Amino acid sequence: MSHTPHELAVEFPAHVVRMHDLKGTNAHFARLCDEYHEVNRAIHRAESRAEVVTEEHESMLRRQRLALKDQIATMLEA
């Protein structure tokens, strides 16, 4: 497992199997997960100062991650 905080398996531990299944059968869900991971890693790089970003950009990334997480949660609960 990654050391990056907020990975989907950590955020939704009860849905790990369902996430795996949906990634294989639902292209939209797979794209949302890929985008979530990309944004989450960008936030982690900003937090760890590996990449310098403005406070506004980091805030925008956090809002984007939350929106993606909400969409993923909705699909997991469906």
Predicted feature descriptions by range:
Residues 1-78:
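Extended, charge-rich alpha-helical interface modules
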